[in-house]
A protein has these predicted regions:
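Conserved N-terminal beta-strand and adjoining loop/helix that marks the start
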Residues: 16-43, 60
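Conserved Nudix-box catalytic region and its N-terminal flanking loop in Nudix hydrolases
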Residues: 38, 42-78, 82
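A short coil-to-beta-strand element that immediately follows conserved catalytic motifs
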Residues: 82-92
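Active-site-adjacent beta-strand/loop module that shapes the phosphate/pyrophosphate-binding cleft
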Residues: 94-120, 151-152
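NUDIX/MutT-family hydrolases
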Residues: 110-112, 120-154
Length: 161
């Protein structure tokens, strides 16, 4: 039983919700992100070319695109990972300062996927690492990952233990 089984959400409603980015909100970056969990419980993080911070894989949601479909597209482009969107479990909406765009805020729709396949960095991804969620892996982490997603994952593991 995955840690998300306790979350009883209206998945369709969550996946189809959107944030209106008007000219007054032009400093917002709307993304879909993945908490990719391997068989050993570690989570996959990526680092974009020319940056220092590791973060969840994913990317920007195109206009009129469902977050889960954006996630599937980005995982295929960045990691060669072909996922079934129906297998992605919606975890919620998380916001934090953007790691690579000073002055911007990232609004992330986060999904969990359990994977047991190899990934290959592609597109703008320079490096991938698997880290134990109990640690920070000894690397620089994006604010969203460090302050929200990893603590959320740790708390969920404690809740089901």
């Amino acid at each position: 039983m995955g840690f998300c089984a306790a979350l009883n959400m209206d998945l369709w409603s969550a996946m189809s919700s959107s944030i209106n980015v008007s000219p007054n909100h032009s400093r917002l970056i709307r993304i879909a992100a993945a908490l990719l969990i391997g068989p050993d419980g570690r989570t996959l993080l990526v680092r974009k070319r020319g940056t220092t911070a590791f973060m969840q894989p994913g990317g920007k949601i195109e206009p009129h695109e469902l977050p889960v479909h954006a996630l599937a597209r980005e995982l295929e482009e960045e990691l060669g990972l072909d996922i079934d969107p129906a297998q992605a479990v919606y975890l919620g909406h998380f916001s934090a300062p953007a790691a690579n765009e000073p002055g911007f805020v990232v609004h992330a729709e986060l999904f969990q996927l359990n994977i047991d396949s190899d990934v290959t960095p592609a597109a703008e991804i320079e490096e991938v690492i698997w880290i134990d969620p109990a640690t920070e892996g000894g690397v620089v982490l994006a604010p969203l990952t460090r302050d929200l997603i990893l603590p959320f994952y740790r708390a969920s593991l404690t809740a089901i233990a």
